[in-house]
């Protein structure tokens, strides 16, 4: 998984920067801690929209994992991790159009929509004007894509006693 995530980061960088990115890319342990940090904070929010117990990293796209790791950096007290988070956010933001263009089926996958929403959320709360403006311009798109995604819902029998 780390290799796929690193490849995603390397696809959108200048050739002269690749060696520095490879050396500075987080270890699997750090990525795991960032993902755990995200879920530990996400779970206690008033509106959690990712279900941590059913999250399986091996079944997610590298874009989604990078977006979650990016969100995990916001809870760290390290400027280095914050810088990493901004870089990861930019990689995810740039990779999403390519991902959706590569296969129309990806637009119907829940993890892809969750990646998109998380990328927008991170941009909105980044405090960087450029990132905030880009995220604001994309806020409507997940609502447009949502009807095409198959999301399992709990189906309750309708009983006349409920009315």
Residue locations for each model-derived region?
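Amphipathic alpha-helical protein-interaction segments enriched in hydrophobic
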Residues: 106-117
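Flexible helix-coil transition and linker loops at the boundaries of alpha-helical arrays
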Residues: 98-107
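Elongated alpha-helical scaffolds that mediate protein-protein interactions in large eukaryotic proteins
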Residues: 81-83, 128
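Intrinsically disordered, low-complexity activation-like regions
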Residues: 1-67, 71, 91-96, 116-163
């Amino acid at each position: 998984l780390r290799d796929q995530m690193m490849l995603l980061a390397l696809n959108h960088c200048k050739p002269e920067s690749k060696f520095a990115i490879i050396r500075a890319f987080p270890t699997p342990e750090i990525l795991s801690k960032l993902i755990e940090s995200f879920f530990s904070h996400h779970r206690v929010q008033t509106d959690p929209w990712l279900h941590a117990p059913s999250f399986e990293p091996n079944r997610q796209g590298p874009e989604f994992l990078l977006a979650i790791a990016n969100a995990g950096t916001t809870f760290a007290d390290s400027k280095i991790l914050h810088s990493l988070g901004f870089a990861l956010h930019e990689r995810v933001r740039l990779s999403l159009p390519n991902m959706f263009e590569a296969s129309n089926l990806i637009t119907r996958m829940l993890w892809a929509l969750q990646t998109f929403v998380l990328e927008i959320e991170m941009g909105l709360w980044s405090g960087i004007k450029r990132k905030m403006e880009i995220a604001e311009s994309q806020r409507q798109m997940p609502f447009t894509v949502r009807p095409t995604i198959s999301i399992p819902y709990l189906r309750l029998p309708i009983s006349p006693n409920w009315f």
